[in-house]
Regions:
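Domain-length cofactor-binding catalytic modules of enzymes
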Residues: 2-28, 35-42, 48-54, 58, ...
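Acidic, glycine-rich active-site loops and adjacent beta-strand->loop/helix elements
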Residues: 46-47, 75
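A generic, well-ordered mixed alpha/beta core segment in the N-terminal half of proteins
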Residues: 66-121
Length: 401
């Protein structure tokens, strides 16, 4: 474990293996005034992200940086355990490829689950493409999103769907991050009126126009990527984030519905594990980390070859009641494509049915991620590992799809 100290807060990092860029990002966060008083804990899968660190957990009060939650609001895994003890991977692949759009594709007609959410309730509804969003429920996306069939040592079969809020989450996150920076670099109406009244009181009426011109913008107290919302914007962001989180859940459930119906599966257990959100009941932000409350069932995926950890939370307050959301990358996507070959990728996936191994998914190969031992050895204080489920089928859309 490492302890990092910034100007306004400190952080515990629950691993000894951390790259310099991640450390720099964490310290930059700890140097922001709105982090003062927060309990910041970094998960063992910590790695640098776009402006902020993946694997972040922190308590919040009345201010939040939208970028800390990120653009894929509500992203997570939907997991089901089947009554069936045998599946046909070729048929499953056909059902997925014919019934679940992936990559940048959306549905030609909305899934029936689209009726379960009203996007007009978004505070920023005029800033998002709601028609595209409704047609995106039941779509996988690309990158590290996946659909897997896994088996445990007792022969139980699980289906796991990993996806999030698609383009809707991106639009909401970008809107509020821009609004945050604009609010921090703009003088309020009250500040402008106070300046005018002061100039009048001082007999400096002739200077009013020049002063107003100089008050068009002010220096932000924080870097743009870490700009925060507060007050009414804070409440609006939380409201819209919860809708995006609901949207992401419906998206995963719609895909699972397509799979279960298409395959004729019988579900005997189902649970959700979310990793980009704010737990508003406990006011804990989790970016690339998951809830691990006492007795809570959760899933930690490792990579395409090694599968996932089925765990039960221990409710450890020192960990912010959290656990890592995965193994964490060893290298960037571009570096992975330079370091490995498709031939190596295919060898690593031997014994797992997949039609998704190729140049476009090379950045997602098992070798690009930390190993299972790197995570299992660090999470004992926060979860109990109940089982390791191994992939028998995997589907991913590449970055060129």
């Amino acid at each position: 474990m490492l302890e990092l100290q910034g100007k306004y807060a400190s952080a515990k990092v629950f691993t000894d293996v951390v790259d310099s860029e991640s450390i720099s990002q964490v310290i930059n966060l700890l140097n922001q005034p709105y982090v003062e008083g927060s309990k910041v804990r970094m998960m063992p899968d910590i790695h640098a992200g776009a402006g902020c660190t993946i694997g972040t957990t922190m308590t919040i009060k009345d201010k939040i940086c939208p970028n800390l939650v990120g653009v894929d609001i509500g992203c997570g895994m939907e997991t089901i355990r089947l009554k069936e003890t045998h599946i046909e991977p070729q048929k499953l692949d056909k059902v997925i490829r014919e019934g679940i759009p992936s990559g940048f594709a959306i549905r030609s007609a909305p899934h029936r689950y689209a009726k379960e959410i009203d996007l007009s309730q978004l505070c920023c509804t005029k800033k998002v493409n709601t028609d595209r969003a409704y047609h995106s429920i039941g779509t996988l996306g690309g990158g590290n999103h996946f659909i897997e069939a896994n088996k445990d040592d007792d022969g139980n079969i699980y289906i796991v769907v990993h996806s999030g809020s698609r383009h809707l989450g991106l639009e909401i996150a970008n809107f509020y991050q821009e609004a945050a920076f604009k609010a921090l670099t703009s003088y309020s109406h009250e500040e402008v009126e106070a300046a005018i009244e002061q100039l009048k009181a001082d007999g400096r009426q002739k200077e009013i126009q020049a002063v107003l011109k100089s008050m068009k913008s002010k220096h932000s107290p924080v870097p743009k990527p870490l700009a925060y919302v507060e007050g009414e914007l804070f409440e609006q962001y939380l409201h819209d984030m919860k809708i995006a989180q609901r949207f992401a859940g419906l998206n995963r459930q719609a895909m699972m519905d397509t799979i279960v119906k298409g395959m004729g599966f019988h579900v005997i257990e189902q649970f959700t594990t979310i990793h980009n959100y704010i737990d508003v009941d406990n006011m804990i932000l989790r970016k690339g980390s998951v809830s691990a409350q006492t007795g809570e069932r959760l899933l930690i995926p490792i990579n395409m070859r090694d599968g996932s950890l089925l765990c039960t939370g221990k409710g450890n307050p020192d960990w912010n009641f959290s656990a890592p959301h995965g193994a964490g990358r060893l290298m960037s996507r571009s570096a992975a494509k330079e370091a490995f070959t498709v031939s190596e990728f295919k060898k690593q996936m031997a014994g797992i049915y997949t039609t998704s191994v190729g140049r476009s998914t090379l950045d997602e190969c098992p070798m690009a991620y930390k190993g299972m031992d790197d995570i299992v050895g660090n999470i004992e204080p926060t979860v109990t590992v109940d089982a390791i489920i191994k992939p028998i089928y995997n589907f991913k859309a590449g970055d060129e799809d």
